[in-house]
């Protein structure tokens, strides 16, 4: 061992350590711990950093308190649509609709159609009580042949028109009867509220009181006259009306007599209380009458396709004529 300036130099052979000799590690250093082994298997990204998906060191222990409660599914409610509304709800809604909208509602779906097809349902009873005058409701004979509330309400919309009438006539409080005031040298008429231009329609007409010299029942357009001076068959006096004079059983149109009606020898005269049914067939352009359910034959044919109204004219003072719309008549 040599000394150099007080420093002790150990030869390489004695140290047995050279730059080329690898350093031996202990056996403990060669064994990888589980943590190191696990870390060595971790995948890295391109930059050498552990990926975000590095698993935790130890799995979490699940406890009853750590498990989130399951959400209970609420029972599935049926879908609510207008076509599934209860009948009571529909009746409450339909009460506020006019007739034209009710007709549209009947064409909307089967449910609404079924609700409105019941002619005595609450909706029709409500509308009937709202529209029909008390005098008509309390009369046991006026609408006796109309069984349902819907038919009675429809008859009201086809009754005499208070705004389309001679100045010497007025409509009674029941809405279905016209009264002629005792005015001399005057012929006075009245038209129905609604005109018709298609389909078959029937009107029951009853004359209450003496007929006088002129008592005509028939049809007229909107342009036919409803008043004139003197006692004349006003209905049938021009090309806008067709009339049957119950006094002499003569048909009139355009100021000309078309013959006796019904076409038989010595036809029976009208008697007070007889029910005359006027039937207008707009599809075949004819009109005819029945008396006490007896068919009297075709009265007018080749009627032009115009909007027609039921009409009457009278000359006798204080006479009254009642008209009730019955809808489409029973054929055959």
Curated annotation (Swiss-Prot):
Expressed in GABAergic neuromuscular junctions (NMJs). Its main location: other. GO terms for cellular component: neuromuscular junction; neuron projection; presynapse; SCF ubiquitin ligase complex; synapse. Gene3D superfamilies: 1.20.1280.50, 2.60.120.920. Residues 79-127 form the F-box domain. Component of a SCF (SKP1-CUL1-F-box protein) E3 ubiquitin ligase complex which is required for the restriction and/or maturation of synapses in GABAergic neuromuscular junction (NMJ) presynaptic neurons. Promotes NRJ synapse development and synaptic transmission by negatively regulating the daf-2/InsR pathway in muscles. By targeting convertase egl-3 for degradation, negatively modulates insulin-like protein ins-4 and ins-6 processing. May stabilize synapse formation by promoting the down-regulation of scd-2. Regulates axon termination in PLM and ALM neurons. This is F-box/SPRY domain-containing protein 1. It comes from Caenorhabditis elegans. The gene is fsn-1.
